[in-house]
Amino acid sequence: MKPIKAITFSQASKATGFPLIELLVVVAIIGILSAVGIFAYSGYVSSSEKKAAENTIRQISLAQTEYYSDNQNYWRNTNATNCTPSSSTSGTIVSQLMGGKSILNNDTAFEMCVALDNVDNGFIIQARHKSSSCVLTFRSSTTAITASNCS
């Protein structure tokens, strides 16, 4: 009978696998890539919200043109020459100017209002982001949308 060889510690621990440092490097790389991805995604979201608000402003402008052809004056939320966008003014635009056709729903990130523009007897549409200081302004005299405090 052959004698049993004793297994030494160095022979027993020769298991193959990834060292801890390699696993930590992989986890760090995945963390960095996900942080960059989340930052880029939030930029895409805010950009798409702004574009959606610009399209809504253009729809309101077209409704204003139709309202003017029927009434010989522009519809507005207030008799003042400026307004403060809110959920109330947005709802009034939908119910009175748009005839109940909801272009401003709960998913819209901006609140809107319409005021008269005394400079050219036209109108101004303002849109303010609900959770940031971004404000979009449309003037009927220039038909341009200007942005302030928007990233």
Language-model region placement:
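N-terminal leader/signal peptides at the extreme start of proteins
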Residues: 1-18
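Conserved catalytic core of two-component sensor histidine kinases
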Residues: 27, 54, 61
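Periplasmic/extracellular, small/polar-rich flexible segments of pilin-like filament-forming proteins
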Residues: 62, 66-151
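Generic N-terminal leader/processing signal
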Residues: 3, 12, 48-49, 124-128, ...
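N-terminal single-pass transmembrane signal-anchor helix
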Residues: 13-41, 45
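Enrichment for repetitive, rod-forming helical segments
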Residues: 9-12, 31, 37, 57-58, ...
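Membrane-proximal amphipathic alpha-helices
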Residues: 42-57
